Amino acid sequence: MKKAGLLFLVMIVIAVVAAGIGYWKLTGEESDTLRKIVLEECLPNQQQNQNPSPCAEVKPNAGYVVLKDLNGPLQYLLMPTYRINGTESPLLTDPSTPNFFWLAWQARDFMSKKYGQPVPDRAVSLAINSRTGHTQNHFHIHISCIRPDVREQLDKNLANISSRWLPLPGGLRGHEYLARRVTESELVQRSPFMMLAEEVPEAREHMGSYGLAMVRQSDNSFVLLATQRNLLTLNRASAEEIQDHECEILR
């Protein structure tokens, strides 16, 4: 029994080290691709030629761009027009920073335009990965379809999700998640990053270890989903795992 336990521990350590090495390999020049697209292509083209290309939209005064992602037919990314690395940035808990999740929700219309018909709100999800859960250094929120199994699980737990951050029964995709119900008026007034930092104990000091997602519920409220990095359980806090970029839910 002792040997079996030791072997299990060794396997966990190897997995953790491998995850760390994988992350380290992805922090080179390629990790700046999105930032270069925003700062060196989309923003200058909009300012000089009133053309957002290669982005779908550039809003310099509002501080964001929307870019069609190469992965998936309907996936878009919302990104700032200035340097923000990710969930670890203290700018995200600054009240003067744009409410990027609310802006990303407004940008879901790009999915419908691309699809050629309205994409139901229940099929849409927003997600941002933790510091170790993403491969790009520039802050970006994924706007994409939700996985059908995640949609079903959230529907079943509708009555269990309250206005406080509480563990979601059963978690999602094999990982633990906190869930919080949010009304549209709350979302307009206050960033989900601030809700997480101010309401979850010790979250403010470890924001970079969290992935965050948002989905609309059948009662027109929203549910915020937060997962924290835990390499011992092989959770890199990649909240994007709740999404399906091939959009099976629309078929």
Swiss-Prot record:
The keyword Transmembrane helix applies. SUPFAM superfamilies: HIT-like. It is found in: Cell inner membrane. The chain crosses the membrane at residues 4-24. Its EC number is 3.6.1.26. It comes from the Bacteria. GO terms for cellular component: plasma membrane. It is a single-pass membrane protein. Pathway: Phospholipid metabolism; CDP-diacylglycerol degradation; phosphatidate from CDP-diacylglycerol: step 1/1. Keywords: Cell inner membrane, Cell membrane, Hydrolase, Lipid biosynthesis, Lipid metabolism, Membrane, Phospholipid biosynthesis, Phospholipid metabolism, Transmembrane, Transmembrane helix. GO terms for molecular function: CDP-diacylglycerol diphosphatase activity. One of its GO terms (biological process) is phospholipid biosynthetic process. It catalyses: a CDP-1,2-diacyl-sn-glycerol + H2O = a 1,2-diacyl-sn-glycero-3-phosphate + CMP + 2 H(+). Belongs to the Cdh family. HAMAP family: Cdh. This is CDP-diacylglycerol pyrophosphatase. The lineage of its organism: Bacteria, Pseudomonadati, Pseudomonadota, Gammaproteobacteria, Enterobacterales.
